[in-house]
């Protein structure tokens, strides 16, 4: 799921007050339980048990703060430090306004630079609760077989052109982010 908002990546020179939000599916989270898959790199998390240390994405489902209605969120470190207003760190609560409604997020993890830079990452269940008017899926991470990325992208763009599908290689997206970040 995808809620449009400010680009909070390093491509935006201004501080973001309403960053885009991505709701991560349960299958995305469980994918990283496997020891053999490539994983995102984490700068810092609130992980306390072994399962959450192995796969910090499970922190998005945490309910440890029963007295608090905040939504667990993961953000990349650069967005958290430089693009959000106010800046955030693990353990920080952020209050942001979406659709004239204040939403409180609790930062449970900070990612290193990744293709997810500039977005607030929450569980799909929390996304559906916060933004019930947003239906369908608009943001995809696709793992293609080695050497087949171009063919997979062409097939998806061809078959989903009426829906406006546009595949961008992760390497290209990261190059764009690093070009700005390293200036």
What are these regions (language model features)?
Residues 1-183:
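Alpha-helical transmembrane segments of bacterial inner-membrane membrane proteins
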């Amino acid at each position: 799921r995808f809620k449009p908002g400010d680009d909070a990546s390093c491509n935006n020179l201004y501080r973001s007050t309403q960053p885009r939000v991505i709701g991560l599916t349960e299958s995305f989270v469980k994918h990283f339980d496997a020891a053999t898959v490539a994983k995102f790199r984490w700068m810092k998390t609130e992980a306390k048990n072994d399962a959450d240390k192995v796969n910090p994405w499970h922190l998005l489902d945490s309910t440890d703060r029963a007295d608090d209605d905040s939504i667990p969120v993961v953000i990349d470190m650069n967005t958290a430090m430089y693009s959000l207003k106010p800046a955030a760190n693990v353990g920080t609560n952020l209050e942001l306004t979406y659709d004239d409604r204040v939403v409180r997020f609790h930062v449970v993890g900070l990612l290193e630079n990744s293709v997810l830079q500039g977005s607030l990452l929450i569980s799909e269940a929390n996304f559906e609760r916060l933004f019930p008017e947003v239906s369908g899926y608009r943001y995809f991470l696709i793992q293609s077989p080695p050497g087949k990325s171009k063919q997979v992208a062409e097939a998806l763009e061809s078959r989903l052109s009426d829906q406006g599908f546009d595949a961008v290689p992760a390497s290209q997206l990261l190059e764009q982010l690093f070009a700005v970040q390293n200036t």
